[in-house]
C-alpha cells in the first residue's frame, strides 16, 4: 500500500491509497475517517474505490493524481 495524498482537518482525515489487490493488480482507494467529539478518531474508515485492476502501479498513481484534483487535494 502506498499513500499518495493525505489531508487532515477539524472534521477528520482523508487520503488516497494505491493498494495491491489479491490478483496482484493495483486499486486506487479514497478513504475518510472522522474525528469523534472527544477529539479521538472513530474506528470506521470509509472506503470508495476510484479505480481498480490496474496492471501498472504507474497507471494507478496517475488515476490517484487525477482523483486528487477532483477531490480538492
Tell where the protein language model's regions lie, with residue ranges:
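Short N-terminal "domain-start" leader segments
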Residues: 1-38
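Short arginine-rich
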Residues: 67-73
